[in-house]
Amino acid sequence: MHYSVLLQESINDLNINPQGIYIDATFGRGGHSKAILNRLTTGRLIAFDKDLDAISYARENFQFSNFEIVHASFASIYDYCLQHSLLGKIDGIIMDLGVSSPQLDNAARGFSFTHNGPLDMRMDVSKGITASQALEELSVDDLSYIFKVYGEERFAKKIALRIKDYIQQNGSIRTTLELAELIRATIGKKEKKNPATRCFQALRIYVNNELKDLEALLENILAVIKSGGRIAAISFHSLEDRIVKQKFSALINPKQELNRITKMLPQDSSQIKLKWITKKSKANEDELNQNVRSRSAILRVVEKL
């Protein structure tokens, strides 16, 4: 069963205009898309996803005249809007970041460290290198950097050395459980969390260019959204949330140079581009009981001035 996390909160905060144009940056299995479509009359929705399974699902189950699915990363939303004369015309954007439940639950996709499958991890299986190939191609230093920065893994160097040594002896790491067991054997089980959690996250982020895609989307998002339009972002780990929070905060409270004489900040309201609608919201107890994966979700919503 796929649950869209913080569904009602995010859709309510978008304040849907029934005649508006909306973007679902991460279609997944269409939970947020369906909720938006239910509130539209003459409005329309454009959804994006890199995952071919998600695209197929949308084409089979979302055959609505006011809905379009685009097989692309959300990093291309600006280019899409530019090509379709939609810059500054979007009423709202929802982004549900990270890996989806169907991706995690399908062992063949290679995201899970508890179910065995090929070590793939690509959200778009039509292009790019697999996680297995990445482990072979990356140096110890690069792999260590990825584990440390993208996974916040304390034992990054130790794990990277063990992986490269294993590959040198065995040729490659082909399956998810092969990698998970190697990590566990390297650092042991020192906490409740599976010891492979952080490295799998880091490798997935690297393979799918997730943080760079997010930065690319946020860099141009003001040009896409109309005045009064809203942006809702749901993140599941601190790296994503930090990027979202910093970008939103920079446009709400822009840093300005201190006046040397008055020692005061100039009141230049033209630099303020957004306002908070929801600074930080988390799943309530009912949702946590229904879907344990919602425990780390953070919703932030802003409105363009």
Curated annotation (Swiss-Prot):
Specifically methylates the N4 position of cytidine in position 1402 (C1402) of 16S rRNA. It catalyses: cytidine(1402) in 16S rRNA + S-adenosyl-L-methionine = N(4)-methylcytidine(1402) in 16S rRNA + S-adenosyl-L-homocysteine + H(+). Its main location: cytoplasm. GO terms for molecular function: rRNA (cytosine-N4-)-methyltransferase activity. One of its GO terms (cellular component) is cytoplasm. Gene3D superfamilies: Putative methyltransferase TM0872, insert domain (1.10.150.170), Vaccinia Virus protein VP39 (3.40.50.150). One of its GO terms (biological process) is rRNA base methylation. It comes from Francisella tularensis subsp. mediasiatica (strain FSC147). S-adenosyl-L-methionine binds at G30, G31, H32, D49, F74, D96, Q103. It comes from the Bacteria. InterPro entries: RsmH (IPR002903), SAM-dep_MeTrfase_MraW_recog (IPR023397), SAM-dependent_MTases_sf (IPR029063). Its EC number is 2.1.1.199. This is Ribosomal RNA small subunit methyltransferase H. Keywords: Cytoplasm, Methyltransferase, rRNA processing, S-adenosyl-L-methionine, Transferase. Belongs to the methyltransferase superfamily. RsmH family. It is found in: Cytoplasm.
